[in-house]
Amino acid sequence: MTGRSAVTAPAVEPPAETPCAAAPQRRTQTQRREEAERRLLDAALAIVARTGTVRLTLAAVGLAAGYSRGLATHRFGNKAGLLRALAAHITVKFQDQMRAAPRRRSGLDAIRGHIEVYFGRTDRQWTTTRALLVMMTEGLMDQTGLQADMAAYNRQALTMFETHVRAGIQQGEIGADIDPAAASVMLLGTLRGVMMQSLLDPDIDLAQVRDSVLAMAERSLARR
């Protein structure tokens, strides 16, 4: 600066440097891509829950997620690719809920745990459940192309139940006369059917129904 002469530094101890808050780490390209995909899928989930898949457009998903109209197309290719990814996204959400729940041993105890988590969801608008049921219902229509993807999604859930039914039979807590495949269809169908009714009629007492479903599962599966 002008007019400033050199001076001797004052003989005082300079204050210790206060550690600054660490600057936010710059995200990697992979992290940014993963966040974009998650936001796109969450936006698609909300749209499907509200209006279904038939009128869903990739441009609308991109805009709803806060990105360009073309990003969803760039990421998923087409509508079928988006819906396939959305089914996987719903699976991951449920798996996250299961991991957050108390750990259960395999067999009948694990089946109880899945029922409790299924009925204990905290999403106030039931967006995920509503979107899934809409996708399954619309999968019955040929023009949506959803049937194969929804059947594959169901097989994952059925396989999980079958695994625990077989484990329960081996452990001696589930009857050896129980057919794992049939029992799994019964369990999954019961859960999905109750949720469909609940979305149509919010007055249904899900806590009471949950207790009844747990008791029914015990009675129908337990070794006699």
Question: Which residues make up each language-model segment?
Answer:
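Amphipathic alpha-helical segments used for helix-helix packing
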Residues: A110, D123-A148
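Short amphipathic alpha-helical elements of helix-turn-helix/winged-helix folds
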Residues: A43-I47, R121, M160, T190
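N-terminal intrinsically disordered/low-complexity leader segments
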Residues: M1-E35
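Residues at secondary-structure transition points
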Residues: P24-E35, G77, G81, A85, ...
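Hydrophobic/aromatic-rich alpha-helical bundle segments in the mid-to-C-terminal region
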Residues: G145-R155, I169-A217, R224
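Hydrophobic alpha-helical connector segments
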Residues: A85, R99-R130, P180-L187, A207-R210
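Helix-turn-helix
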Residues: R39, A43, I47-G81, A85
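Generic hydrophobic, amphipathic alpha-helix propensity
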Residues: R33-A44, V61, L86-I90, F94, ...
